[in-house]
C-alpha cells in the first residue's frame, strides 16, 4: 500500500503540488488524469524517488520512504516507466527483459512477457532495442520489462504517448 501525506513540491519558484494526499491499496489500478502542466509527471517522479518533495511524507507498506532515492525505492518494489522509452544500442529485447527480471530467463520465458503485451515474440526477442523500433514497439517492450520486474508498484508516465 502506498500513502502520500501532504506532499508539496515547487520548481523555479512555482508551486507544482500542494498538500497532495493519496492512498493506493495493493492490487489496484489507478489512473491520475489532468491537463498538461497539472503535476501528474511530477507526482510520479516524486513517488519513484526521482524528485524529492519540499514537504510531506511517502509511506510504502507503512514504512516512511520519503528520504530514499530512486535506487532504494526500486529495491523496495517501485518501478517507473518513462514517457519516452530508452533505446539501448547493442542490447537485445531478450537481454533487456532478463535484466529487468534480475534472472537469466529462458527464451521461452522472455517471449511470454512479449506475448502478454500483444507482440509476436519471435519477431522481436533477438532484435536490438534501438532506433529501428517504433515508439509503439518500444512502449510495449517497456511494459514487458515492467511485468518481468514483478514490482509492488509501477508508475507509468504518459503510457499511451
What are these regions (language model features)?
Residues 146-147:
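ABC ATPase C-loop
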Residues 33-35:
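The feature captures the beta-strand-to-loop junction immediately N-terminal to the Walker
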Residues 64-79:
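ABC ATPase NBD coupling module
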Residues 2, 17-19:
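Conserved structural motif at the start of ABC-family nucleotide-binding domains
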Amino acid at each position: 500500500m502506498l500513502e502520500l501525506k501532504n506532499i508539496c513540491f515547487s520548481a523555479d519558484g512555482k508551486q507544482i503540488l500542494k498538500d497532495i494526499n493519496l492512498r493506493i491499496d495493493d492490487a489496484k489500478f489507478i489512473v491520475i488524469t489532468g491537463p498538461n502542466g497539472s503535476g501528474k509527471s511530477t507526482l510520479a517522479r516524486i513517488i519513484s524517488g526521482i524528485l524529492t518533495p519540499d514537504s510531506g511524507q511517502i509511506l510504502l507498506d507503512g514504512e516512511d520512504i520519503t528520504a530514499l532515492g530512486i535506487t532504494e525505492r526500486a529495491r523496495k518494489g517501485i518501478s517507473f516507466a518513462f514517457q519516452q522509452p530508452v533505446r539501448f544500442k547493442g542490447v537485445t529485447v531478450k537481454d533487456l527483459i532478463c535484466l529487468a527480471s534480475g534472472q537469466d530467463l529462458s527464451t521461452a520465458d522472455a517471449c511470454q512477457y512479449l506475448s502478454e503485451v500483444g507482440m509476436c515474440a519471435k519477431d522481436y526477442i533477438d532484435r536490438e532495442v534501438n532506433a529501428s523500433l517504433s515508439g509503439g514497439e518500444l512502449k510495449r517492450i517497456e511494459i514487458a520489462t515492467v511485468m518481468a520486474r514483478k514490482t509492488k508498484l509501477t508508475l507509468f508516465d504518459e503510457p499511451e504517448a
